[in-house]
């Protein structure tokens, strides 16, 4: 049977130019890593000047239907008959919270939320937990103002972030507490310190009933250098690590003992710490600027830390232009 995925309108304009190709690559990765290669003959097509990604698949089961509904680019999903007629299918979204959680924040340097969702999905697909619908523990060790944390919460996962920039910590803390209040969600927020580092713990209930029953989503944000993860969290605490590495600017405070300025130095020193925090069967997904760090070098760093690097034509097809100085790509490593 033939299907068609309507690609979501994307902003900024530069990302929109790559959206169909990125959607096709994401679909192929999910097919290979989660669905046993069930999706074939993937093509980018236009119907009436509107971009779609089409593919062939058996009748959709629950797993494939849910994954297709939650691809980063999915705006609508259709079956496609031999006459070219499109029949809409219900979307089975994983979202547990309102979508403005990931879209409402606007600030310079924010990663496009569609790409954040794509990176999250590809990392989840590589893990041993891709077929499970349960709350996972997700870490962003360079979390900025929390785009990845918000995506994790959207999907019903527990989110943990570490960020050295105190202004980002303060901005996220204000945002998330204001957001849950505006949505009238039952929650509890506690601000304190851990190992001398400022920390926010927030637990929220998707519904009042779930909150009363103790069924909450948790977000933890620690204002610290990423290397402090080893002292703040126990080993094997996280199912997924998803992060957007710095694109060539300093991520860290001044001083010999703090994070190195160059992305390659940062990742080389931080990856052993991140790897130790990852549970067996988990996965690490990293987005980075491949104009400042070659893919081969980053793959080598992942492999040296005991991770199986995901390599396929689809996995190697996520590179896209952000601006003149940034060509963003992603890479994923699996933990045995």
Task: Name each region found by the language model.
Residues 1-26, 62-63, 71, 80-139, ...:
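Class I S-adenosyl-L-methionine-dependent methyltransferase catalytic core
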Residues 21-88:
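N-terminal accessory interaction module
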